[in-house]
Regions:
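Terminal-appendage/accessory-domain detector
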Residues: 1-168
Length: 168
């Protein structure tokens, strides 16, 4: 969703409807239609797609809470999203079709197992997600140091400092 938004400068207010096609296994796992809790939001493709199109960080744990899943702008867009079974998809693939109010249609097919073509962007996203998840467990300073060490891993003699930091 975020890639389509960037590529076509999509304004969510001009979206008529969105269809997401995935294999039935993902429908069983990540298809909570109207999440009520933050945890349910994490398992709702409709909710996370709406967040992404609205520019929200879907990798940030703090964005999955009861207030966010009830946020009017997100709910309004979420309710225009339909997730359907598409057995032509691979196990980690999704196809998205965004129909705009002006009649134009934007489509993308992605595989979440495929690395981002922009490795710097991928590193930034993964680092931010790690800091968000590890910070509360081992402390922000230690988490930041782990990211720093992993960034220079090819020059490391061993992993002793990384493992020590991760122990908390």
């Amino acid at each position: 969703a975020a890639n389509l938004k960037r590529a076509h400068n999509i304004d969510p207010a001009n979206v008529e409807k969105i269809e997401i096609g995935v294999r039935d296994t993902l429908l069983k796992m990540c298809n909570i239609q109207e999440p009520v809790t933050g945890l349910e939001g994490k398992f709702s493709m409709r909710f996370t797609a709406a967040m992404a199109l609205l520019g929200e960080n879907t990798g940030l744990i703090a964005n999955y809470n009861e207030d966010k899943v009830q946020e009017a702008e997100i709910v309004n867009l979420r309710d225009r999203i339909n997730v359907v079974n598409n057995q032509d998809m691979g196990k980690a693939e999704a196809a998205m079709s965004i129909s705009m109010k002006d009649g134009s249609v934007h489509q993308i097919r992605t595989d979440v197992e495929t690395p981002d073509s922009d490795l710097d962007r991928q590193w930034s996203r993964l680092s931010a997600k790690f800091l968000d998840m590890a910070g509360p467990v081992i402390g922000d300073a230690k988490a930041a140091r782990v990211v720093e060490l992993v960034a220079g891993l090819e020059n490391a003699a061993d992993l002793n400092e990384v493992t020590a930091l991760c122990k908390g």
